[in-house]
Amino acid sequence: MSETGTGAAVADEAALVAGLRARRPDAFETMVRVYTPRLLAVARRLVGNDEDARDVVQDAMLSAYRSIDKFEAHSRVSTWLHRIVVNAGLMKLRTRRRKPEE
């Protein structure tokens, strides 16, 4: 799956979303493989370390999978996932602020 904006990429995204909605494990694996590198970079910039970034992306991927039926395709899957990662990262930062470092 590419993110070039071509017709093929749009068709790939539509197929991915259809697979996720059908709860096919291969579709989830594809989503993780294709989008994790970029999302990890976003999460690292937001939370500041690799361990928390991996947690954020994992939480975001599971959240996206569980709520794929809410995806309306007004934007690209990558945009939707980016927003979910940012929200998960902000939640991680809020949680971190509430807990003093031990």
Predicted segments, located by residue:
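A short, glycine- and basic residue-enriched loop/turn
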Residues: 25-28, 36, 50, 54, ...
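Short, charged helix-capping/linker segments at alpha-helix termini
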Residues: 3-5, 21-30, 40-59
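Structural recognition of an alpha-helix C-terminal capping motif at a helix-to-coil junction
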Residues: 55-62, 66, 75-87
